[in-house]
Amino acid sequence: MRFYLAAFFLALSGYAQAADLPPLATGEQIKKAVAGNTVEGSMQASGRYTEFYAKDGTVSGKDYKAVWRIEGDSMCWIYKGQPKDCWRASIKGTTVQWVKDNKVQGTGNIVKGNVNNF
């Protein structure tokens, strides 16, 4: 009986976590928000970032380049030597929250244009 109760509460916590997520953007909404703009923010796993997302699908950071693209309702990145990494996003105004595994794991501020001349 304890096992079933533990499983029930574990499952319930997953539903609560998913219910706490902000509304997720469509692929088209993500593309419209980031293409041609810079996003500055922080990710739980890797810390601060500043990236420019060119309309041609190129990502530029301070000392690197990568590729970005929309697949369905996810934004995917391909950094040199790394596997493709796809995330969902919640966008409200100029604020983006990056969502993976039903958790917000990063945030950013969308700034118009290539403000750092990457």
Task: Give the ranges of each region predicted by the language model.
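Lipid interaction determinants
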Residues: 14-118
